């Protein structure tokens, strides 16, 4: 039941992520090398917002669709005594998800332009942007709605504070690590 719930929420924001990536690839002259992207938030503001929403949901940011399933899986894993190794591996996997999501956002939208092909703005094409906006809405509201539909009785899990905040702690630490690594690479490349 929990796996199906996670599959549904994950499918919604992952589909949004892939559609946004497709729009960026199409708009950047069909190049798929992320190093040639950079600064695309100026040309694709709506896609930037939608893709960041999907990334945040993938990372399990509270009150987005991914939070409801991912947090429940983490809490259930912490509740059962599977051993410290399994918990550590799970938290490392959560951290790696945040690392590559932040890297994707930085290289595509924040970082310097990588010198790829010319950018053709295609956000005015409603056949491309329409599904992205609809999936963005589902990434916002599908977590609680699917949770209420899948679990008629609320799932209450009692954990010690350090386990309850463990996932968010690892997410925050991995975010700081990624930002510092990006800063080091940027200063090494241009400094």
Language model region names:
Residues 1-35:
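Alpha-helical multi-pass transmembrane bundles of energy-transducing inner-membrane proteins
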Residues 30, 46-191:
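Specific lipid-exposed transmembrane alpha-helices and their immediate membrane-water interface residues
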Residues 35-36, 46:
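Active-site helix/loop module of the DD-peptidase/beta-lactamase fold
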Residues 36-39, 119:
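Beta-strand segments within the central parallel beta-sheet cores of soluble alpha/beta enzyme folds
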Residues 42:
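Conserved non-cysteine loop/helix-boundary elements of the Radical SAM core domain that shape
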């Amino acid at each position: 039941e929990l796996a199906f719930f996670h599959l549904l929420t994950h499918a919604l924001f992952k589909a949004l992520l892939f559609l946004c990536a497709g729009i960026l690839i199409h708009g950047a002259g069909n190049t798929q090398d992320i190093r040639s992207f950079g600064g695309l938030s100026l040309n694709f503001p709506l896609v930037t917002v939608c893709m960041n929403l999907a990334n945040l949901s993938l990372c399990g940011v509270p009150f987005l669709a991914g939070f409801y399933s991912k947090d429940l899986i983490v809490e259930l894993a912490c509740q059962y005594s599977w051993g410290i190794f399994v918990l550590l591996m799970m938290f490392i996997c959560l951290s790696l998800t945040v690392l590559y999501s932040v890297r994707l956002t930085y290289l595509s939208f924040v970082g310097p332009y990588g010198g790829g092909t010319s950018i053709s703005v295609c956000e005015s094409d409603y056949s491309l942007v329409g599904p992205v906006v609809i999936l963005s809405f589902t990434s916002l509201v599908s977590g609680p709605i699917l949770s209420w539909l899948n679990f008629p009785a609320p799932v209450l899990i009692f954990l010690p504070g350090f386990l309850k905040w463990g996932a968010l702690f690892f997410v925050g630490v991995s975010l700081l690590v990624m930002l510092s690594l990006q800063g080091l690479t940027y200063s090494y490349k241009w400094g």
